[in-house]
């Protein structure tokens, strides 16, 4: 059944976390590797040439002077069907993954005083104390939007993207605020304190499908674990 549906789609293999890829491949293709050699090669090529080299590729672009920006969304938990459901996310992808390394409190929590006091510089710390962008791969060009879901793109985020593309901006330069709030209006707001949540965006219908697919992948992971046992 898996091979006739999700496991037969390369796009879904591209979303398998790096740490789970080999186990998932062994579960699905054990004993039929030769029959699916072409498909496996396609997925392996993407993993080795794109997924595993993402940071290397971005660093190379940066060293060549090519400007780019990373915009992450947050203030939601991951889907409540797996062990990492408390991760701060956009409702689908953790902020850590989106931003290439931000340090985050769990959803509904803030970073501890001990952690904050350990920072040499707090300029990359979010005003709501949920995110520390100093650990990002590119802290100077990483921006965060609070209260916006994974696959929704209202006018404010599009306007921000256009503004970033038209400016040689950095966080230290002050052209744009690193942490902003989406409250459903036409403009992003500056986050000024701990309790400023605004009005969270209404959950889109597509989240029903996201929950289904997340549950499906969690089911596959459990199959892998049971096979190991």
Can you name each region flagged by the protein language model?
Residues 1-229:
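Lipid deacylating catalytic domains
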